[in-house]
Amino acid sequence: TVSISSTDAIGHAYGTRGKENHDVYMQLDKDLAHFLDVLDQKVGRGNYLLFLTADHGAAHNYNFLKEHNLPGGAYDYKQAVKDLNNHLQKAFGIKPVMGEDNYQFYFDDAMIAQAGKKKQEVIDEAIDFLKQDEQYVFVFDYEKVAQTTMPDYIKTRMTNGYMNHRSGEIGFVTRAQYFGAKNAPDYKGTSHGQPYNYDSHIPWLMYGWHVNQGETNQEVTINDIAATVCGMLKIQAPSGCIGKAVLR
């Protein structure tokens, strides 16, 4: 596995439309061409199978969007935690929100228990408060996400990002093209992490051994890579494989 991490770092710093991002992809194109030439020489054309993909896409820089009269903006997660804690202090006498990360709010179980409060009541109150803020499109209890009213594709993607004991108690979806960043007129960067298509739109390319030229319009995901390789090799997929083979 070869990780090409410079595109991620530069994309975060300068945005999807930045000239710096353009430059790094032009250089990457040359590097990939050299890499394929070396494989052809050392391994032999048709004797290797190569996949090219990514783990996420990205939103456009919100200042770029504003310049083109399109919606977008910064989500101030620090202020969100502060406002939520202030509200919960009025309601329960405690500030149990430890922080926000990856569009999830994390709660201090020990603080809630020590105060003699019921955690579910605290979470429900927090959700009711957050839902009043128009910057949130959906706010939900991760333990009850199946009961939440939101489109299936968003619900599925948010559920896929949940892991017990590691994820937060409350998840949320901001308005499209709004992401956690500083709010400044000179901000050039961007981020990702929401279930919208621009965050999940990635390359999915395969090249080499037993791969004919072609394309498909069907939806594919990173999870399909392992399933596809197993299908090509005619072997059983590993226990953790949840994708579908993309075979033509």
Locations of the language-model features?
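Soluble non-cytosolic domains of exported or imported proteins
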Residues: 19-26, 116-121, 216-223, 240
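Solvent-exposed, polar/charged alpha-helical surfaces in well-ordered, non-transmembrane soluble domains
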Residues: 26, 30-37, 124, 128, ...
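Short connector loops/turns at beta-strand edges and beta->alpha or beta->beta junctions
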Residues: 5-10, 177, 201, 207-210
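Extracytoplasmic/secreted cell-surface and envelope-processing proteins
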Residues: 10-13, 59-63, 114-115, 181-183, ...
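Active-site His/acidic residue clusters
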Residues: 1-28, 34, 66
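Secreted, luminal/periplasmic, and some membrane-associated catalytic domains
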Residues: 19, 30-178
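Short, surface-exposed loop/helix-turn segments at secondary-structure junctions
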Residues: 182-191
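Substrate-binding rim/cap in mid-to-C-terminal beta-strand-loop elements of soluble/periplasmic
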Residues: 79-116, 190-233, 247-248
